Amino acid sequence: MQTGTVKWFNSEKGFGFIEVEGGDDVFVHFSAIEGEGFKTLDEGQSVEFEIVEGQRGPQAEKVTKL
């Protein structure tokens, strides 16, 4: 698992990016956020996640808020 900080997240479109210290930003889709109900992330929020290879490059999976 990796940790990072939410760079930005658009709740209307359902995606954003997570900033990883010493690495490239990672794409995150709302479907990768763990938990029930409305899934969104706040800018500056700390998260833990796994990186998988998506169709357009690395993306976050199993995202949990810290």
Curated annotation (Swiss-Prot):
Domain CSD residue range list: 4-63
Pfam families: CSD
Subcellular location: Cytoplasm
Single biological process term from Gene Ontology: regulation of mRNA stability
Record GO terms (molecular function): DNA binding; nucleic acid binding
Annotated GO CC locations: cytoplasm
InterPro entries associated with the record: Cold_shock_CspA, Cold_shock_domain, CSD, CSD_CS, CSP_DNA-bd, NA-bd_OB-fold
Source organism, top-level taxon: Bacteria
Alphabetic keyword roster: Activator, Cytoplasm, DNA-binding, Transcription, Transcription regulation
Subunit structure as annotated in this protein's UniProt entry: Homodimer.
Protein known as: Cold shock-like protein CspLB
Species: Listeria monocytogenes serovar 1/2a (strain ATCC BAA-679 / EGD-e)
